[in-house]
Amino acid sequence: MAKVFVVGIGPGNYENMTVRADRALAECDVIVGYPVYVDLVKNRYPGKELVSTPMTQEARRCQMALELAKSGKTVALVCSGDSGVYGMAALVYALRGENSEPEVEVVPGLTAACSGGAVLGAPLTH
């Protein structure tokens, strides 16, 4: 049985994606996400199966990622910013329930708040 990486891809460009996120996306068989986020990464990771669902279909998207992993595929569920801050990580764990399968690995990303503060010259220090 494979796993689900819940991947925070940062605020929207490859330069702000973590090395760990890049590795998870390179390793996966399937990239699942909101269409805009899938579009942001698909050209960098050719040959991947791409699955997307529209806005308001977050639970369905997470369930699809879990089902794909249960079928033996390694899945990257992509989220903007950090996957644990208004991302899909909590929902994936909730939908998986108390089962230990499929394995879930949360890959944090750069939050939009931190990125925005840096761009504006106003880092979030106080």
Identify the meaning behind each predicted range:
Residues 1-107, 115:
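Class I S-adenosyl-L-methionine
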Residues 110:
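Active-site histidine-anchored catalytic micro-motif
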Residues 117-126:
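Short, glycine-/small-residue-rich phosphate/pyrophosphate-handling segment
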